[in-house]
Amino acid sequence: TKRVTGDTILYNLLNLKQVTFEVTDECNLKCKYCGFGEMYTGYDIREAKYLSFNNVKPLIDYLCELWNTNLSDSSLPITFFSFYGGEPLLNMDFIKKTVDYIEKLNIRRKILFSMTTNAMLLDRYMDYLVEKGFHLLISLDGDRYGDSYRVDKCGHSSFERVIRNVKRLQTNFPKFFADNVNFNSVLHNRNSVQ
């Protein structure tokens, strides 16, 4: 077996492809198949915790300092700062502070931003996400029936709202949509490919 050494850790930090922040464990949906949902027992309880900028600033500063040394072996590496949840758009204040801070740093590498989202709040924040060039991974399990496990906290389907927000994004920002938007689906008994 290969031992992890300080040099191995340093090499991996210098060549980091992605930094992912769990922005919040809170979600505005209650998907039936979620690991926090009704089909599972013995899971961690969601506590509606929100990540604060003050908690991630030291990490960002450390990585920036490290990446700006001459130790990096790549001419212009690309690193994604990714936002995940729960539903990350529920903590948009954190996302904006983090993105604004990173953009002000003089980091010697290409920085991109990405997010996995259920798109329920996309209508509120799409202008900002487009302006910052976010790469979006939108969770959608298919048509209305295929997406029927993805419900809000009252048990109502999220499908209509998500589709409306996705179509609005596609209509208002067609190039962004073509270049920066992908979809993530959970295969299950209502949408699985046979």
Task: Outline where the language-model segments fall.
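Conserved alpha-helical substructure of the radical SAM core
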Residues: 3-125, 132
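Conserved AdoMet/S-adenosylmethionine-binding subsite of the radical SAM
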Residues: 90-194
